[in-house]
């Protein structure tokens, strides 16, 4: 050990509590020290002579502390006094017997007799333990001292009893005083101003019952811990042979290279453990005393450690078990032959310095990582974290509970635990705490569950807002109907598993859960919107039943071949290339002849409640008159089944027309011939983007978006052009109750690309990312609904029809104070079509105005639709102003 006062290395065989070597290593080391001591110790001195010569000696290096008087004890006296003092003070307090020198195996006699050579024989190995059976009483004495800190009173209580009279019978006044001072040294450990305490320590393999010194207050660098005292006694060759037993009590012996002698180190400081990166060092406070000095700042609760020496625990401390060796993977923690070498945390060749701040960070990281069991994800940005927290909190229950401000627009959404949507999920912030601290780049968002989150939030908002909206059974009163282009993120197309079985499997799709919820809720869909949950959708059978019940509807909604929802389960139909039959188109749009006229007349007829959006494909070769819904049918049976361009995987993936029954009650007939209703039930437009390896054919569509003011049902007419190779689906998102086909446009303000992306879902099958695709042309109540959808889409990077999205089909006519959102087109869309420029959108009633857009690109599975929206922008804005 390197002492400040000695300025030379001292070989420390010190009292490392629990850090001793195995017996053979200690024996070898002690032998080496003994031999070196024999060679260097002067032979003409005995213990008594040294004791008398240094009784009043002072060290010139550092002044003596008032708490550290020169001991003036011989090595034998120091061993006896230390054993008795620890038995009186420490053992009762700690509850076990600390290490002992056990030199009192000899008869208890004064040092005068012990110094005689004839008394060194081991003839009477009688251990003097006067305090057996008094542990509780002695512990109470220590506890009282911690309160009143009365040294004399505590000493009297500790030494009361018959044993003390016998013990001090052969002691002179000086020896009694030395013993008393030594007990005081141990008692001062429990003073409130000591700044440290002694605690049990079982870390080290060589000791079962060890102890350690822990700071109780903050110590600054170069502070002296004066009460942490070490008492030193020089050892002669005879005393070494007499007192030390290899591997038993030679744990606290140092060799001074300056004095060329072995020294016994006892006292409270003997309980300081070794560390290869210590925070303290020993400094001399007198000829035979020392204390501890802080090498760096020490925080409360941090163990006080010193450096014993380079070879104290074997050669190069190869058997050291300190915390630093554990962290660095050295010493006893170094990998052995055949074991993989642990990578050092910071102790690499070109690593960072082991500063206190870095080590504290590592320590905190380790603690937090233990606490965080399932931190599956973390957001890539702070905005993500905030938004995820909002969404997760709103997901706690599927009942009404609208989450209020989730305006942060993040590109990706952190994944939530994969549990049913109804199950409670902790907010991401909580997850982060649990999860410690996983680097952001290591966090992988789980794709499918985002749509679930999005879906449930949307349903809740719709459910709550439906109460505030005026939705009557006889006639649908729609306040401020607005078509919202919901701007979304770039969409990656991935190959989607075919078949109903894959719906639940792909990308962790929640198809089964959606079906389960549908079974519970679809019965409620027939009720008026005020009663029904927004997250319901109907099956083909229920569609027939409802249509039969609603005789007022002029349009027959024939079951779509693609309508594969039976009992809430998606059944994809094989891709037969079937197109909507003329019957269907006629039934869907009995008054389609007036559709285009209606679209033109809409701004004029608009009663400031509806917005007219006219979107036309750049190459318009065939305008679809497949706009559904006769205004007369009071039941949303007018929910035309738009023939949406469904996702057309080259293999038998479902696509085609889907009949969407509308649970909208008694819509008022549109004088223009096209009733426009802002359906709360726009179905979750999750359209499947199967990223098939086969070459895809791009289908061109003619599109027209019409808003009629009479019934408030927005209508989008999509028709396949003659030159296109795919089939078309008319999309009408008017079905309040449940429409399985929807177009949702979402705008992500954080997205770099300013292109529209729309997803069309024919409601037939759920794709791999089914939970994530919720983009549609929808009437948007809240800006908040935008965030999760866009993010869910982007995060999954997969566009697929989502059964969960259908759950949102039955949305009550809510307060659509929605603004039209532009969505960014996906350059990664399989069509490979170029991204369009800044896309507009109006309808930011009280939200951020969006940049103007010239074209709108709807990406439907493998197909895309280009809609010219620049020509209608001014009219739309004027309509909005009028509204």
Curated annotation (Swiss-Prot):
Zn(2+) binds at residues 276, 320, 322, 325. S-adenosyl-L-methionine binds at residues 99, 204-207, 211, 258, 273-274, 321. Its main location: nucleus. Keywords: Chromatin regulator, Chromosome, Isopeptide bond, Metal-binding, Methyltransferase, Myogenesis, Nucleus, Repressor, S-adenosyl-L-methionine, Transcription, Transcription regulation, Transferase, Ubl conjugation, Zinc. CDD domains: SET_KMT5B. Residues 36-52, 723-734 have a biased composition (Basic and acidic residues). One of its GO terms (cellular component) is cytoplasmic ribonucleoprotein granule. This is Histone-lysine N-methyltransferase KMT5B. PROSITE patterns: SAM_MT43_SUVAR420_2, SET. Residues 24-35, 422-436 have a biased composition (Polar residues). InterPro entries: Hist-Lys_N-MTase_N, KMT5B_SET, SET_dom, SET_dom_sf, Suv4-20/Set9, Suv4-20_animal. Its EC number is 2.1.1.362, 2.1.1.361. The gene is Kmt5b. One of its GO terms (molecular function) is histone H4K20 monomethyltransferase activity.
């Amino acid at each position: 050990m390197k002492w400040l006062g000695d300025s030379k290395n001292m070989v420390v065989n010190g009292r490392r509590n629990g850090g001793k070597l195995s017996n053979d290593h200690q024996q070898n080391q002690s032998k080496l020290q003994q031999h070196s001591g024999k060679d260097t110790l002067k032979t003409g001195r005995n213990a008594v002579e040294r004791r008398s010569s240094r009784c009043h000696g002072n060290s010139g290096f550092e002044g003596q502390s008032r708490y550290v008087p020169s001991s003036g004890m011989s090595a034998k006296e120091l061993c006896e006094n230390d054993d008795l003092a620890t038995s009186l003070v420490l053992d009762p307090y700690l509850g076990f017997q600390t290490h002992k020198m056990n030199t009192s195996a000899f008869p208890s006699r004064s040092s005068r007799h012990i110094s005689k050579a004839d008394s060194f024989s081991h003839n009477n190995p009688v251990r003097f333990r006067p305090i057996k059976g008094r542990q509780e009483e002695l512990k109470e004495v220590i506890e009282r001292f911690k309160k009143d800190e009365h040294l004399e009173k505590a000493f009297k209580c500790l030494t009361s009893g018959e044993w003390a009279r016998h013990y001090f019978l052969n002691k002179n006044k000086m020896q009694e005083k030395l013993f008393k001072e030594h007990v005081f040294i141990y008692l001062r450990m429990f003073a409130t101003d000591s700044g440290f305490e002694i605690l049990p320590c079982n870390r080290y393999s060589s000791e079962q019952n060890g102890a350690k010194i822990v700071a109780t207050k903050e110590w600054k660098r170069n502070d002296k811990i004066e009460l942490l005292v070490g008492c030193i006694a020089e050892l002669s060759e005879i005393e070494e042979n007499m007192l030390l037993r290899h591997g038993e009590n030679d744990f606290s012996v140092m060799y001074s290279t300056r004095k060329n002698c072995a020294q016994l180190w006892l006292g409270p400081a003997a309980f300081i453990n070794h560390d290869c990166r210590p925070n303290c060092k020993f400094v001399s406070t007198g000829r035979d005393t020392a204390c501890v000095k802080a090498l760096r700042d020490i925080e409360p609760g941090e163990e006080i450690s010193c450096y014993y020496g380079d070879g104290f625990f074997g050669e190069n401390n190869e058997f050291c078990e300190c915390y630093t060796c554990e962290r660095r993977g050295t010493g006893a923690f170094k990998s052995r032959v055949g074991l993989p070498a642990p990578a050092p945390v910071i102790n690499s060749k070109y690593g960072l310095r082991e500063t206190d701040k870095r080590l504290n960070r590592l320590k905190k990281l380790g603690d937090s990582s233990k606490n965080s069991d399932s931190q599956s994800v973390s957001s890539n940005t702070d905005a993500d974290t905030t938004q995820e927290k909002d969404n997760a909190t709103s997901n706690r229950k599927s009942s009404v509970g609208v989450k209020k401000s989730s305006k942060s627009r993040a590109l990706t959404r952190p994944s939530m635990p994969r549990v049913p949507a109804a199950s409670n999920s902790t907010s991401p912030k909580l997850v982060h705490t649990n999860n410690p601290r996983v680097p952001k780049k290591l966090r992988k968002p789980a794709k499918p569950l985002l749509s679930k989150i999005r879906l449930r939030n949307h349903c809740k908002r719709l459910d709550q807002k439906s109460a505030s909206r005026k939705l009557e059974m006889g006639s649908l009163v729609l306040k401020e109907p607005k078509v919202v282009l919901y701007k979304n993120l770039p969409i990656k197309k991935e190959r989607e598993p075919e078949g109903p079985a894959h719906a639940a499997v792909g990308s962790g799709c929640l198809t089964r859960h959606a079906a389960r919820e549908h079974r519970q809720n679809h019965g409620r869909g027939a009720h008026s919107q005020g009663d029904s949950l927004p997250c319901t959708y109907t099956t083909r059978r229920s569609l027939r039943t409802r249509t039969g019940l609603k005789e007022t509807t002029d349009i027959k909604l024939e079951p779509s071949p693609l309508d594969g929802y039976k009992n809430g389960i998606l059944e994809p139909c094989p891709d037969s290339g079937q197109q909507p039959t003329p019957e269907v188109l006629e039934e869907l749009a009995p008054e389609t002849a007036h559709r285009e006229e209606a679209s033109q007349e809409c701004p004029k007829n608009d009663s400031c409640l509806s917005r007219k959006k006219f979107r036309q494909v750049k190459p318009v070769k065939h305008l679809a008159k497949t706009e559904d819904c006769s205004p007369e049918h009071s039941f949303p049976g007018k929910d035309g089944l738009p023939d949406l361009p469904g996702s057309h995987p080259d293999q038998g993936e479902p696509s085609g027309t889907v009949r969407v029954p509308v649970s909208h009650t008694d819509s008022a007939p549109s004088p223009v011939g096209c009733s426009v209703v802002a359906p709360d039930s726009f179905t979750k437009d999750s359209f499947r983007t199967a990223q098939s390896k086969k070459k895809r054919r791009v289908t061109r569509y003619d599109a027209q978006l019409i808003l009629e003011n009479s019934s408030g049902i927005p209508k989008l007419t999509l028709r396949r052009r003659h030159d296109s190779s795919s089939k078309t689906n008319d999309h009408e998102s008017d079905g309040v109750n449940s429409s399985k086909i929807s177009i949702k446009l979402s705008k992500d303000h954080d997205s770099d690309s300013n292109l529209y992306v729309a997803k069309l879902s024919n409601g037939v099958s759920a794709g791999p990312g089914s939970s994530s695709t919720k983009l549609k042309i929808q009437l948007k109540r809240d800006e908040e609904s935008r965030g999760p959808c866009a993010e869910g889409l982007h995060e999954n990077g997969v566009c697929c029809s989502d059964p969960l999205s259908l759950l949102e089909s039955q949305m009550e006519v809510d307060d659509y104070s929605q603004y039209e959102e532009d969505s960014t087109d996906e350059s990664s869309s399989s069509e490979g079509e170029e991204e369009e420029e800044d896309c507009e959108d109006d309808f930011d009633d009280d939200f951020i105005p969006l940049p103007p857009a010239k074209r709108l690109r709807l990406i439907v599975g493998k197909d895309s639709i280009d809609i010219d929206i620049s020509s209608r922008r001014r009219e739309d804005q004027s309509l909005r102003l009028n509204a």
